[in-house]
Amino acid sequence: METDFYTQTDKISDGSSGNLTEQNINQSIPEENEVAELSKKGYALIKENKIDEAKNAFKTILEKDENNNYALVGLGDAERKQNRFNDAADYYSRCLASHPGNNYALFGLADCYKAMNQYHKAIDIWEQYLIHDDKNITVLTHVADAYRKIRDFKKSKQLYLRVLDMEAENAYALIGLGHLHYDFKEYRDALYYWAKMLEVNEAAVDIRVLTSIGNCHRKLKTFDKGVYYFERALQMDERNFYALFGLADCYRGMNQQFRSIEYWNKILELDPKNKVILTRTGDAYRNMGDYVTAADYYNRALNIEYDLYAVLGLALISKGEGRYEEAIISLSRLIQTDRKNHRLYIDLADCYIKTNRKAEAVDILQDFQKLGLRSSAVTEMLEKISA
């Protein structure tokens, strides 16, 4: 088929061209060349991170052709590079209004919606893209990721598996499936996909794969296996928060409090005002019977800001030292601020039992049940008291 240009010149030769003349066509050729050069320059400037200069180049094109698809997509890309996603989305939308189905505009617009956490809109756009290219692995994994973000397990998994049918060892699909199953608390399945990722890339493994495998073992309470992967991660980065946290928590789970303290304190060397870690360290010292040091860590956490678990830790120290009335007052206050925490009711009931107030212990446990909540620990304690 002839190009538009040759079709137009044929019309000129037979006198059917209307206002077109050979002269104005000759004038349009340099203009087209100028637009092409400006477009090429704009994209090169984006690659060099000279965003403002790139925008100027694309805007010059729009002065000549307000609907030029290269310029509109280029401006969208430039705005997106500066994290101005609303402005970028406007340019991509303008392009699509004049050039429906432009793949670059579709991809850019979907990426903007994803960045703005508007996952449903991103999915709609990507599915339009897939009409034109339903085997694009990058887009398929993006759509699967978006479905995962809106917690549509079935559609997300279907798309990840579709990618694996096309490319059995695709890293994005394997990692995505790992995250998907982990998010839905299916830790064994998550472990399978992350282990597969490790197997595929053993020589150059990403540290996040190691910590993810370790986290699955933490959740499955196979703490000794988790230790191995967190230690491997630390060999890659001795300051990695997730590896240090994972090791501390695994040793806590194995009841090796002295080892967990070692890693909690390593985190505190890097982040001394982390109140969650201060409280965890306090818990470890308390479980070892070192109430003085434990209280110091809890108070350090509370000096940063209020923390329920630090207050609970101090209440449990009072209980551990036989100061039951103090513990009862603290635990009763905590229940007022966190009525659904079954642990508070159990500790308070235990204080009542220790002070020979069995009826009050039963009452407080029944108060929890009246909330319509279920806890096997509360039920078992109530049955034991009532027996």
Place the predicted regions along the sequence by residue.
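Structural marker of alpha-solenoid helical repeat scaffolds
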Residues: 64, 98, 132-133, 166, ...
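TPR-adjacent "capping" and linker segments in tetratricopeptide-repeat scaffold/adaptor proteins
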Residues: 18-37, 60-63, 201-205
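Register position in tetratricopeptide repeats
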Residues: 47, 81, 115-116, 149, ...
